[in-house]
Amino acid sequence: MSDHDPRDLIVIALSGVQRYITESQTTADLRAASQIVAHLASEAVDHLKKDHGAEMVFPSTGVQGGEEAKDGIPNRVVALIPAGQGAIAATAVKKHLKARWKGWVEAVFGEGLETPGWPVIYLASVSFGSRSYAEAWELAQRSLAERKNIRDFSQPGHVSEELCMLSPRWRAVNKENVPSRAPEHWKGEQLAVANWVKRLWGRDADGDQRFPSTNAIASLPYRRAVLTLWENVPGVPELVQRLHDAAMTEPLASDPIKETRTPGLPEQPSGKVPRWLRRRGSRWIYPETWHVDALARECTDSLDEADVLKTDPSFIRTVRSGERAARELMELMVAEGVAPPSPHLAVLAHDVDSMGKYLSGEGEGQDRTRLDLSRGHEEHSKVSARLARTATLQRAAVEDAGGVVIYAGGDDLLALVPAESALEAARACREAGDPGLPHASDGLLFFHHGSSLQRALNSAHELLEEAKEIDGKNGLGVGYIRSSGSNAKCVLPWVGRETQGPSSVQSSPVDSLELFVPSASHPRARLSPRLLSDLLAQRNHLDGGPESATQDQYEVLRYDVARRVMKKLVLRHTSLTPGSGGTNEHSAQNDKAEKEAFAEQVTESLIRMAPKQKLIDENAVRIALFLRQEAR
């Protein structure tokens, strides 16, 4: 576009998107919120093109469309409009989006109810006049920032309803207004209008929008192994049949939650029971699911009814039978070299660093190039195409790792991944980034499938923000939250520093962390949790201890000596699960060599994850131990 092209530049931004998406109770809520945002952005694009003759810049023409666009279109829309029509078109788009949202609300409730503060739509329109595209872009960004600083505290009048359980900034819908189409088991939930639209989105949109649950994603590697060994290991079909029979006995069979098929599971074997394992069987393969008191409460509407059910001999027999089948199946799989089902999965939040500076031509891509906005809007159109290609590659990378994508826009991504392959997915998404775009940072949070999804999402985004605070950004924030509430986190640069010891040239913290994932390295090796306390007990002598310690009180060992001591401690807490080679002398020698090799790699990896001039980072050690125990 020439500097004197007679058109207007408009920028439309949907704000509050991350908040609306993360205020989700289930994975289906999460997916629906993402699709609602994507549909709003898509509506803006369609309206601009059809009603205002717009030339799209973000997303550029030809990059949207198909299934992937439903959750991959960016929440930023940029277009060129005939001169003098920019402000009119921007206002019309805002009105159109508000009307579309109102229509979705009416489809759920049968009437138009207010949703103060959602959706939030910011507009900026700039007439070119004698301005260049670069000048118009800069002015539009300033105008947009100024509009965002003007807070609109739109609130309804005084109402007495309870606060929404997901979004306490809103009041919940009263019982009389709960959508009639809501399933019976949802009608007791205190949800605001906007969250009822989210909850029922899959039932009102075209197609089946159900989404795998957290326990389905966490158990995917184990269920895949069960299905793979189905026809080759005697006992597997019979034990899964017993699991199925127990789970399909009343009142357990009346579970109203319909589980969708988890992507990544083999199509064979066929039949009713394998089909059940691919869908509703995900929660029942965990022995801990089969708890009499918990299931009695789940299957009844009151505590009094639960007290009666948990003393019912028939109910107790059913639960005990299911627990035995799950435990025997786990023991059989372990004997075949398959780890027990992990109760954990991970949230992966990925975001390109300094995207605003890059789009303004002030920041560099990974290839050290900058955008030249003097060439006009084509520079941004090329970026849009790069983002679309990146989103496609990242989606494939997550799916290859057994994960499911919530949204992927090229500059950001949110996904749920099994614990076993979470680090693999994080690295693959990074490698899928276009070299012309800036580096990206990541937040990776491991959590128990029965824990709060909303807390996990918020924690993953907090880790992402912390990763962006390190020097140069380009970081990985990783942490975990156990079902007990215990947690740890650390932030590491993607490109590591050189260490003094013998290095295997591990340049990324993922390389160091991945050593602790059993399926990635030394699957027989185990680390005792007591390693942490021993390392902390010797920390002052190994590296001087934490910064708060009085340095003069301790004699700090020379680096090579400290490293040997550290390796000795690691070796002391390393054990191997039984192998298939028996107990002869040759096997014993092999085991000793494997333990030595594992201890050497663990020592090197822990040092690489420690701050400069230190050998130990307490939280990094905690995460390493967690991965070795739970990322299976």
Task: Show which residues each predicted segment covers.
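Regulatory and interdomain segments flanking nucleotide-handling catalytic cores
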Residues: 1-632
